[in-house]
Amino acid sequence: MKPITPRSYALGWGAAFLLTLGACSPKTTSVATTSTTPPPTAEAAPATPSAAASFQIPVEYYTLPNGLKVVLSPDHTAPTATVAAYYNIGFRNEPRNRTGFAHLFEHLMFQGSQNLGKMEFIQLIQKNGGILNGSTRFDFTNYFEVVPAHKLETMLWAEADRMRGLAINQANLTNQQGVVKNEVRVNVLNQPYGGFPWLDMPQYANKNWNNAHNFYGDLKDLDAATLEDAQQFFKTYYAPNNAALAVVGDFEPAEAKAWVEKYFAGIPAVAQPPKPDLTEPRQEKEQRFTKDDKLATKPALAFAYHMPERNTPEYYALILLDQILLQGKDSRLYQAMVQKRGLTDDVSGGINYLGNAFNYAGPMLWMGNLTYDQTVKSDSVVSVLDQEINRLARGGIDQSTLDLAVVKLRSNLYDQLSGSDNFGRADMLASFALFDNNPARINTLEGEFRKVTPAVMQKTIQEYLRPTNRTVLIVNPLAKS
């Protein structure tokens, strides 16, 4: 897992919470082949970039009898294929007394399966010139592979092998408990601004335990995880009826459907426990907190506002307000805090620091953060934030400003969908399948934003960008500069 660096844009598909596979030093062992499809010979993956140009993306969506949601999106621009498996289990719905378990289990998924020994899944992709990774987010855990197109069947076989049965033993569990605890020490406990604000702010701003607990996990909880816990967690949450599979790239849909049926259809469904209640009460009073940081040399400040419910007109409006206020050097807050007043060198943030504005399911925060010199007062920073929001509220947002925000967002979104590895497309398709049962939303998103009116923008500012809906977290630096 890599430490999170807040991005300067809201829609990035960045490497948030990605498992660092390059440091795994895979063994040079052969791959077991008890499956009906033996792993093919190694070949280098071509690097031709994809050229997705619009939201008119091919989408074929269906559900297997065992409940697995499948999305196929052919793209013959480059001879590569991307496989993305998304499981509907993330930080928010991990067991109460097992904080950090969702992320711990992400690591266990690379420790071997029925037909692939420890590290052999990684070796299989790397030998075939591919790349792979996994991440743990608020509402899902995902795994993806990008390989030469003619290796697609092998990747589907391998991903199904993990879903069918994982090598969960005490040695693997103990080893990965140590790895995760070390990540906590390195990335949070022994790092200046460790966990700020992506890990800290949800704990201060939210009231519901599911949204507010330490996502990385308490070290005692990580130690307390038993082999039985891990086995039950896999059996429950890594079931086909709790997952979505997206396949994007250079393939023929009929052939890909046959492979998906061949390898995934026989995996049995498992009864799912009730989903936890993730709702947050309406915040009626501003909250301010201070966190001492013995390793930080400069003060830092983060602000957070509770988001509107996903897929509502106000939700789309706040995404556009984020473009106006916080995204890029032409944004209102950058201009006011950096260019005009010199309070900071940069201000960044967005919606969903562990992903983007679309790939989550529960409550979310719109956040921003910055560091500043000791001579700057935190009240001055908050005052400028209020001034810029009030300027929008008083002056209103005319149609031309709104149109510019849509164009800015559209450009950013298209950039992410045109990545050469097709992960941006796979991520959105799998997320929309998992949370909305409608991956074809990818082709109607721009239309949803164009429905937002200046009146809806004003309503959203008044309800969601009010000071009483805000949490402010200040880092008090204790280290000498």
Language model regions located:
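An aromatic/glycine/proline-enriched structural segment found at the starts
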Residues: 45, 207, 240, 244-309, ...
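Bacterial signal peptide processing site
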Residues: 25-27
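Hydrophobic helical h-region of N-terminal Sec-dependent signal peptides
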Residues: 14-19
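C-terminal motif of bacterial Sec signal peptides marking the signal peptidase cleavage site
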Residues: 21-23
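Bacterial N-terminal signal peptides that target proteins for export
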Residues: 2-13
